[in-house]
Amino acid sequence: MERIKELRNLMSQSRTREILTKTTVDHMAIIKKYTSGRQEKNPSLRMKWMMAMKYPITADKKITEMIPERNEQGQTLWSKVNDAGSDRVMISPLAVTWWNRNGPVASTIHYPKIYKTYFEKVERLKHGTFGPVHFRNQVKIRRRVDINPGHADLSAKEAQDVIMEVVFPNEVGARILTSESQLTITKEKKEELQNCKISPLMVAYMLERELVRKTRFLPVAGGTSSVYIEVLHLTQGTCWEQMYTPGGEVRNDDVDQSLIIAARNIVRRAAVSADPLASLLEMCHSTQIGGTRMVDILRQNPTEEQAVDICKAAMGLRISSSFSFGGFTFKRTSGSSVKREEEVLTGNLQTLKLNVHEGYEEFTMVGKRATAILRKATRRLIQLIVSGRDEQSIVEAIVVAMVFSQEDCMIKAVRGDLNFVNRANQRLNPMHQLLRHFQKDAKVLFQNWGIEPIDNVMGMIGILPDMTPSTEMSMRGVRVSKMGVDEYSNAERVVVSIDRFLRVRDQRGNVLLSPEEVSETQGTEKLTITYSSSMMWEINGPESVLINTYQWIIRNWETVKIQWSQNPTMLYNKMEFEPFQSLVPKAIRGQYSGFVRTLFQQMRDVLGTFDTIQIIKLLPFAAAPPKQSRMQFSSLTVNVRGSGMRILVRGNSPVFNYNKTTKRLTVLGKDAGTLTEDPDEGTAGVESAVLRGFLILGKEDRRYGPALSINELSNLAKGEKANVLIGQGDVVLVMKRKRDSSILTDSQTATKRIRMAIN
């Protein structure tokens, strides 16, 4: 009230009224600007003006019990006068200093856990090494890069559910945590953050950094993995670069790198199998990368690479609409074309059937080490502007563009026959034939292309057929630029289809990707890749194939044994025996197979000749298409360790060694597993023990279905009959006893009855 009286008093004086009306501040617009709305219009001025006051801060009353009235220097820390319009206390900035020095200390145990990404960044920088600074023109191209090292790969929605569950577990709202990674992270974080006093909002922000991939479209020359991007401002300017080696790796970069390697291996392997698409899917579903299922990573990881995109397409996921040719990503930026089949003659008079694109089109081409802009018409290159790291990279881009243009002079530059094949020994399509041909040697192509005088354009220079730069002349339509071409920024994903030969097409039928586009580069994965599929056994060489094949038979022996006696053909056709065939000398594969199949048939016919170990040992040889011959073998050859090694038909060898006492099988000296059943105990032991509670009725009776293994007998109901396969590969009919009392006598009768049933 005092203040208001004072103001009224002031207003009654004519001088006050004059000052307020005559000075320019009465401009209504200005007064409105600074007084309307809650948004501060000049924060820095407001801050300076506030801080110049004695008590610019307000705080809850209880702070007066925690802070003394005066500090050590005798300066007042808070005012006894209440803040006008609220029941808070007015406080001096000196109080903040006092609090920072003398206030209570909370537990810091949660800080490294919450601010994990920051702590890890500091460690990486501490251990990173910065090299010399070089001054040179930087060819930067904008790429979509990951700016947030050390994150998991959850989608925004998945992360939101995890954060809500961790930070606000009691809030209402449906949250369904479904994926493996969501559940693991939630459990881990809840444990880490027990009794955490950091504000929930801050915790939520920091969790988001840890869980979600954040990407930006940034100009980059050099490394694009997130540990390089976080120091982009330190490593490259407009005309300089600083060498840098990160002081640590992060899992997200490792996942991206390992995913690419796994996908390339899988696509290459699938391409040579009988049904590439089915094989690819089987391998993707049975592979783990760093302990996470590959299919889960593919669903979440936005990496764009040819092999990765083929795997995604096979799983029915959307991929980028750009297409790949010669290792470059092409994105059409304008124009359109229609396809028409045309027959053309090469310089060697070989006929090629080309799918010619008719119409004017412009493309950006982005590769690992070079980029370009390409303008073309029907079978004519109009202009190509290339930029690249070095001469080799520029050559690669020019060759790809010239082939892509489908110009006649390119086709006429072919010398010799085109007969390139893919990994499965199938002829490549004509465009890839041409590409391979000129990638091997582009000399004739460049010589035949033709040259033209050029105008002097800033930042552009000509290039001659021998790859020397020139300011006067250049290959027709081709220029080299200092500036890179940005990657296509649009991250839209489109629905695609894939055929059984792994060719990926968009909805208009244009081929975006095919196995020919998958890089042959071999790398060493950062995370462990576990391929459970038998198709990938050969990735670690012949020894691995040998060991894995025998391990698989031993692991699945119960079912293998039944198939061996009931349905051998189905067993021989199992894909698990496919890799083994590459170890058997081609010329003799058929004879081995015929010999082993005949031997097995005798075992089935002549009772008592069933020999578990021999069946396991010879089974993989029976998988090849058999040739009928009267040849007998005492040993079979496999090609491992660079030479032929022998497996003895009867008895042990270094390749296949079974120890009867320990029941362990070693293959090439490495453990291949233990046989759970005992192959040598005659009819009595195991079977009679297991057949307790069953009555043996006689020989096999097909009406009661296929033979069960001894392990499957437990599922029978009392009084139910079934055929059962006993250790010797013989099948008998049994019935589960209706009463338990007579079980003891069963094991004695079983032995006699088995003998009778067999004989």
From Swiss-Prot:
Coiled coil: none annotated. It comes from the Viruses. Keywords: Cap snatching, Eukaryotic host gene expression shutoff by virus, Eukaryotic host transcription shutoff by virus, Host gene expression shutoff by virus, Host mitochondrion, Host nucleus, Host-virus interaction, Inhibition of host innate immune response by virus, Inhibition of host MAVS by virus, Inhibition of host RLR pathway by virus, Inhibition of host RNA polymerase II by virus, mRNA capping, mRNA processing, Viral immunoevasion, Viral transcription, Virion. InterPro entries: Flu_PB2_2nd (IPR049110), Flu_PB2_6th (IPR049114), Flu_PB2_C (IPR049115), Flu_PB2_CAP-bd (IPR048298), Flu_PB2_middle (IPR049111), Flu_PB2_N (IPR049106), INV_PB2 (IPR001591), PB2_helical (IPR049113). One of its GO terms (biological process) is DNA-templated transcription. It is found in: Virion; Host nucleus; Host mitochondrion. The record marks K627 as: Mammalian adaptation. GO terms for cellular component: host cell mitochondrion; host cell nucleus; virion component. Its main location: virion. Plays an essential role in transcription initiation and cap-stealing mechanism, in which cellular capped pre-mRNAs are used to generate primers for viral transcription. Recognizes and binds the 7-methylguanosine-containing cap of the target pre-RNA which is subsequently cleaved after 10-13 nucleotides by the viral protein PA. Plays a role in the initiation of the viral genome replication and modulates the activity of the ribonucleoprotein (RNP) complex. Belongs to the influenza viruses PB2 family. Influenza RNA polymerase is composed of three subunits: PB1, PB2 and PA. Interacts (via N-terminus) with PB1 (via C-terminus). Interacts with nucleoprotein NP (via N-terminus). Interacts (via N-terminus) with host MAVS (via N-terminus); this interaction inhibits host innate immune response. This is Polymerase basic protein 2.
